[in-house]
Amino acid sequence: MSIKTEEISALIKQQLANYNEELAVEEVGTVTYVGDGIARAHGLENALSSELLEFSNGSYGVAQNLETNDVGIIILGEYENIREGDQVKRTGRIMEVPVGDALIGRVVNPLGQPVDGRGEIKTDKTRPIEKKAPGVMARQSVSEPLQTGLKAIDALVPIGRGQRELIIGDRKTGKTSVAIDTIINQKGQDMICIYVAIGQKESTVRTQVETLRRYGAMDYTIVVEAGPSQPAPLLYIAPYAGAAMGEEFMYNGKHVLIVYDDLSKQAAAYREISLLLRRPPGREAYPGDIFYLHSRLLERAAKLSDELGGGSMTALPIIETQAGDISAYIPTNVISITDGQIFLESDLFYSGTRPAIDAGSSVSRVGGAAQTKAMKKVSGTLRLDLSSYRELEAFTQFGSDLDAATQAKLNRGKRTVEVLKQPLHKPLPFEQQTVILYALTHGFIDDVPVDDIMRYESGLNDYLESNAKDLMDEIRQTTKLPDTDKLDAAIKAFTEGFVPEQAADDKDSDK
């Protein structure tokens, strides 16, 4: 057998030509310090700001401080298994969270991992947690109402889809309850809700989730939970993770409501991180970019232009004050970023006025344009009536001689306060709110005893749904007031037949 050297050499040349050695080049650094959710690494000279980094044990971190010799890293999750000398490598991407319909009805942590014990979340979509907010030309003005179901808000401080409305007040004044009631009221409104719990007790979050589930609100709600026992970096990124999940729906033409409960705790977590990273402290030891922390988050809420699908994301950030001081550093920052605030007052709360909304300090800067015509008509003089009542109430403490006009204003004011009260987790449909406020502002309730107002309201709604359903349907469908003569006649008929509780008791005792 003869060996053909030409064939062998051709075969070797062909194999050499096809040989391709793939080299994986990675920039790797070494951990020089770790503790309190923070790590420092040497050797990552080309790392980018906010880049996702991977530790040798599989944990992840985010590059925060880019210094001459070191990179300051916040560790996402547990840091106990990371040691000095461990390797850390660049990934070339920024942090992303899973998004999409699969998250609806679930409770997740800020990394998008389920914490409700109901199995894994099957979605292949992800979004970066940091994203540039829509520009001026990508937005349109707020024009659609977002009904909270709370008379005091929908009448006095209306909210529109795409608005940022701050809920502010001392601890235990009902801030979370306002947000939860608003989420419950979105049932059937084609709205996806996201509740971001930042630093809230695990037991409290469990209670809120059970409440949402009981009222069927988890069918359209995602809960993002970062508990107080978790490292500060997770509390810091939680609102951005929630915003990324909301943007997935917003950019697909859907409407989103996102609640940040609360941003005071996120600011405290960011202060902790910044001090550990040895950034220069400023006022109240917060870093210099604390304003940017909240502005870049809240600016992501918007009503998109029709060219981009017309979707919206409405933000309800919550801020906790100390002794009602809304002029403190973080409260004034967030007030200046948002489109209005709902101020909840301790004195009102403890006196039984719930929701404890202070009409004088609460304002909505853009929601008025989104308010329905019916609500605008019936609530026109409400704020003025309420503020004049507060003044007269203070004045009457010094004397009891009042003329008839002043007494009438006081009587109307007492009934206004009573009408605006609402039981917990009982949001009212828009048409029922409109009718009771119409009855109030047109004097139908002036002779109803204050203690019977809630019973009167409930009875009036039942009566109109049974005997004047066409009027209620008209308000519901057109969002305008129907024929006022018919409405007056229906309310008058019910009012004349309404028996106050005291009178009913007297009749029973006579028998």
Swiss-Prot record:
GO MF term list: ADP binding; ATP binding; proton-transporting ATP synthase activity, rotational mechanism
Function comment: Produces ATP from ADP in the presence of a proton gradient across the membrane. The alpha chain is a regulatory subunit.
Required for activity, annotated site positions: S362
Chief subcellular location: membrane
EC assignment: 7.1.2.2
Subunit structure: F-type ATPases have 2 components, CF(1) - the catalytic core - and CF(0) - the membrane proton channel. CF(1) has five subunits: alpha(3), beta(3), gamma(1), delta(1), epsilon(1). CF(0) has three main subunits: a(1), b(2) and c(9-12). The alpha and beta chains form an alternating ring which encloses part of the gamma chain. CF(1) is attached to CF(0) by a central stalk formed by the gamma and epsilon chains, while a peripheral stalk is formed by the delta and b chains.
Top-level class of the enzyme under EC nomenclature: translocase
One Pfam family in the UniProt entry: ATP-synt_ab
Keyword terms: ATP synthesis, ATP-binding, Cell membrane, CF(1), Hydrogen ion transport, Ion transport, Membrane, Nucleotide-binding, Translocase, Transport
Binding site for ATP: G169, D170, R171, K172, T173, G174, K175, T176
Annotated compartments: Cell membrane
Recorded family membership: Belongs to the ATPase alpha/beta chains family.
Family annotation (Gene3D superfamilies): 2.40.30.20, ATP synthase alpha/beta chain, C-terminal domain (1.20.150.20), P-loop containing nucleotide triphosphate hydrolases (3.40.50.300)
Coiled coil segments of this chain: none
GO cellular component entries: plasma membrane; proton-transporting ATP synthase complex
Catalytic activity: ATP + H2O + 4 H(+)(in) = ADP + phosphate + 5 H(+)(out)
Family matches, as NCBIfam families: atpA, PRK13343.1
Topology term for the membrane: Peripheral membrane protein
Naturally occurring in which organism (per UniProt): Latilactobacillus sakei subsp. sakei (strain 23K)
Protein name as annotated: ATP synthase subunit alpha
Residues annotated as transmembrane: none
